[in-house]
Structure formats: structure tokens, C-alpha cells
């Protein structure tokens, strides 16, 4: 079985060719203002046009609200990856598959952070 690969943090249109050539399964686009990899909608859409149709596009967010989820869905992402705190509104608004990234300092935190699922 081949592992699936996501290349994340794309910043410019030229990055799309790298993702295409590398054979990645997923391309990650960061939407978090505190990140140096943060993109505007316009930047992301320009890069997305150059991504091969076989590569799934992942919107990476931190503590998104329902409005941000709806905007990302309009942009034709395939998956939404959420970090941070999740609101019930954001989860309810998500009509796409959701990946929830959890940072743990010890295994006991897993149950506490995932009991709402």
C-alpha cells in the first residue's frame, strides 16, 4: 500500500507545478492570518487553477467559524482540515469531508479532545 502525500503551504502559482510533478495526492492551502503561509482567496484560486484535477485540494484552517467554512466550500475545496477549537456551527456548516488535526502532549489528551465526536 502506497502512503498518501499532502504537500501543504503553497504560496505561489509555481508551487502548483511542483505539487503536480511530485505526484502528491493532496495540496494544502493555509487560511490562518498568523501563518506566514496564509493566503487570500484570490491567491488560492490562482494556484488552484494550476493543480492537476487528480490532486485533492485541502483548505487548512484554525478555529474556523461557519462563515469561513461556507466561503471555503464555495471555492471548490475537496477537504477542510481544521486545527484549534471547533465550534458546533463550523462543524454543522461543513458539507465536505473534515480532517481534524489534534496536537497532543500525552496520549491521555486524546479522549478529552475527541469526546465531542
Residues of each region from the PLM?
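Conserved N-terminal beta1-alpha1 strand-loop-helix module at the mouth
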Residues: 1-117
Amino acid at each position: 500500500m502506497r502512503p498518501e502525500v499532502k504537500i501543504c503551504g503553497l504560496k505561489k502559482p509555481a508551487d502548483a507545478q511542483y505539487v503536480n510533478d511530485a505526484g502528491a495526492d493532496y495540496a494544502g492551502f493555509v487560511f490562518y492570518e498568523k501563518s506566514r503561509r496564509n493566503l487570500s482567496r484570490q491567491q488560492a484560486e490562482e494556484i488552484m487553477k494550476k493543480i492537476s484535477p487528480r490532486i485533492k485540494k485541502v483548505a487548512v484552517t484554525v478555529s474556523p467559524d461557519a462563515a469561513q467554512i461556507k466561503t471555503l466550500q464555495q471555492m471548490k475545496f475537496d477537504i477542510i482540515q481544521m486545527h484549534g477549537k471547533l465550534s458546533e456551527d463550523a462543524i454543522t456548516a461543513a458539507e465536505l469531508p473534515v480532517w481534524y488535526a489534534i496536537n497532543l502532549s500525552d496520549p491521555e489528551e486524546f479522549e478529552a479532545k475527541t469526546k465531542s465526536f
